[in-house]
Amino acid sequence: MLSHRDLGLTDKEYEKIVELLHREPNEVELGMFSVMWSEHCSYKHTKHLLRDLPTSGERVIQGPGENAGVVDIGDNLVIVFKMESHNHPSAIEPFQGAATGIGGIVRDIFAMGARPIALLDSLRFGDLKSAKVKYLFSGVVSGIAHYGNCIGVPTVAGEIYFDDCYTDNPIVNVMCVGIAKKDEIKFARAQFSGASVMLVGAMTGRDGIHGASFASENLSEKSQEKRPSVQVGDPFMEKLLIEACLEAIKIEGVLAVQDLGAAGLTSACSEIASRGNKGIEIDLAFVPQREKGMTPYEIVLSESQERMLLVVKPEYEDEVKQIFQRWDLYSQKIGVITDDGLFTVKMNGKIVAQVPTKALTEKVPVVEMSFEKRVNSGNADVPEPENLQETFLKLLSSENICSRRSVYERYDHRVGINTVVLPGSDAAVLRIKGSSKAIAVTTDCNGFYCFLDPYEGAKIAVAEAARNLVATGAMPVGITDCLNFASPDDPKVAYQLKRAVEGMAEAARFLRIPIVSGNVSLYNESKKRKIYPTPVIGMVGLIEDISYICDAAFKNEGDLVVLIGENFSESACEYTKVIWGIDYGKVPSIDLEVEKRVQQVCLKAIREKIVSSAHDLSEGGLAVSLAESSILGNIGVICDLRANIRRDFVLFGEQQSRMIVTIKKENLPLLKKIAEDNNISICVIGRVAGKKFIISVNGEKVIDLNIDEIREVYYTSLEKWVNE
């Protein structure tokens, strides 16, 4: 029998288990506690930090604690969304790790009764010069494309960053968004004693056993031995499961639905019973098994994919079975909901484990972390480049700025025919069939900023996500997050985690955007490297009328280019990192009051229908944002930028709370009025014209290129980096 230490439990945790059970646990029970009390399932390091996040609001139907968050968008419609990580599995088996990450997050959405309509992925990899990184990159992208394309859910947005700190630990965060009717939402709460517990979907095998525990430890040289802990997905089975579950959920007698993800039956059964303050009894002999001779330990801990747990009134069992039979899926009653508060596991009628449900879900000892502030070395002495045009082209072609088109072209981003604004803009926009409304979705986080200052970096991540939505004409209505950090046992990492959560909370609270779901992924480090603190923000926004939809592409010859939020800085940025190799300094400052008013100006102008295009300023600064809008619109721009700081930082600095919009000349007075009403400065910096990309600084021309030249650099560089 494995010891508690072999399973990742501490001596203190084992003593707590004995106290809760009033006896020593047997092997099956010990395995159940090991997965449920793993960091991945229990959040034992972060529970107390996450309590400070703003999770309520007038639109919030369901916050954290369910399969996904739910936000009301009116007309009896809700958005259901969540983000999760699949970092450790993707580091070991990138194709299946990423693919099953997609499968798991999609199940969280339709478990709530919502039809999945969009996927997003936020990815981080190491230096592309490494053969290992190229292997991981190729496998992850292929896994996402394979699974997402096969299930018919479009991958519409996301982000990819490269940095050496992610070489051993790629970050694979996936987000799914669904739409449902408000009165058809289902919850994972078993509140009816005597109800049948049905396992539906695929058969159970030995794949993924202890996957949750594996995801809660540092990677090492021995991690490759844990490839069996990586689940294997079948997207065609998932597609059948989506349709069957959405049909079954409409039955009155289906009371609760729970995805089987991390920790398999152990997690699904204990959580669905615990939320309803009930007990649950199952017999593993009734679980459809695809492998012979599986032990109770293996069955109850298996993380085989494409499985769901349904709580059903007994008289509706046959109706549910008929639906799943029609979709060629297994459906089997494996147990009942009880009043005793216990999770009883039997095998052929004999009890093999019996544990209080809340002991598994709520009684894990919280880990008290030690905190130590990392000392920032201050601003660097940045040289000034001689040739700003060459510098611009080098920056535009760099891994973190060049287009991701070669990646998103592999994803079917149009399936479902809802995608209105395609990948490549600030955010994706999807129509809602049968409604005049639309939704915008995005993911954002600059890990470099968070490394330099986790508090300010996390605030910036929230603010930039909101700016991206506003640029499409959307009002931000909800956040999901994925907190990716190294080992919290390191006081400096614990400090980063604490400050990042505080920064997220402040920005979300100030901008009045509730955080309704999320995920924590810790221990993303190896002996050689720790990842940057990477609190990824997923955000959804509501566009009240499809006539308000805006994108980043320049459109009309002669339109004025207007900068909203006229400020510049000489802070650390992608320019200082890429061009000069400086990976330290002070992050760009952000004033949340200014940020809020800049967003209000842009959104009001879009709703007044005077804006032809809108674009957020982020990595690469003003020059890169202008280039992106020119490339997207296939039309040139002539700009003259005026500022009292160095020319390179005028072009490439990343001061926050700035956006560029294009308008017709006759609409400038109205835009000025909107800006004045919000006490925000604006400045006409140029006009849309011809096929040239020309930028002057204080009257001196510093960039003069053809649109075709910058398009070639922008669109082809990533593929060159991958293939060289």
From Swiss-Prot:
GO process annotations (BP): 'de novo' IMP biosynthetic process
Binding site for Mg(2+) 2: D108, D259
Keywords on record: ATP-binding, Cytoplasm, Ligase, Magnesium, Metal-binding, Nucleotide-binding, Purine biosynthesis
E.C. number(s) listed in UniProt: 6.3.5.3
Source domain of life: Bacteria
Signal peptide: none
Binding site for ATP: Y43, K82, D481, G518
Cross-referenced CDD domains: PurL_repeat1, PurL_repeat2
Pfam family for this entry, one: AIRS
Pathway per the UniProt entry: Purine metabolism; IMP biosynthesis via de novo pathway; 5-amino-1-(5-phospho-D-ribosyl)imidazole from N(2)-formyl-N(1)-(5-phospho-D-ribosyl)glycinamide: step 1/2
Entry's Gene Ontology cellular component terms: cytoplasm
Active site: H40, H86 (proton acceptor)
Molecular functions (GO terms): ATP binding; magnesium ion binding; phosphoribosylformylglycinamidine synthase activity
Class of this enzyme: ligase
Catalytic activity, reaction form: N(2)-formyl-N(1)-(5-phospho-beta-D-ribosyl)glycinamide + L-glutamine + ATP + H2O = 2-formamido-N(1)-(5-O-phospho-beta-D-ribosyl)acetamidine + L-glutamate + ADP + phosphate + H(+)
Residues annotated as binding Mg(2+) 1: E84, N519
Chain sites annotated for binding substrate: S85, H86, N87, H88, R107, Q231, E303, S304, Q305, S521
Compartments in which it is found: Cytoplasm
Quaternary assembly: Monomer. Part of the FGAM synthase complex composed of 1 PurL, 1 PurQ and 2 PurS subunits.
NCBIfam families cross-referenced by the UniProt entry: FGAM_synth_II, PRK01213.1
UniProt family annotation: Belongs to the FGAMS family.
Protein function: Part of the phosphoribosylformylglycinamidine synthase complex involved in the purines biosynthetic pathway. Catalyzes the ATP-dependent conversion of formylglycinamide ribonucleotide (FGAR) and glutamine to yield formylglycinamidine ribonucleotide (FGAM) and glutamate. The FGAM synthase complex is composed of three subunits. PurQ produces an ammonia molecule by converting glutamine to glutamate. PurL transfers the ammonia molecule to FGAR to form FGAM in an ATP-dependent manner.
UniProt-listed HAMAP family: PurL_2
PANTHER family with a match to the protein in the record: PHOSPHORIBOSYLFORMYLGLYCINAMIDINE SYNTHASE SUBUNIT PURL
Protein name: Phosphoribosylformylglycinamidine synthase subunit PurL
The species this protein was found in: Pseudothermotoga lettingae (strain ATCC BAA-301 / DSM 14385 / NBRC 107922 / TMO)
Gene that specifies this protein: purL
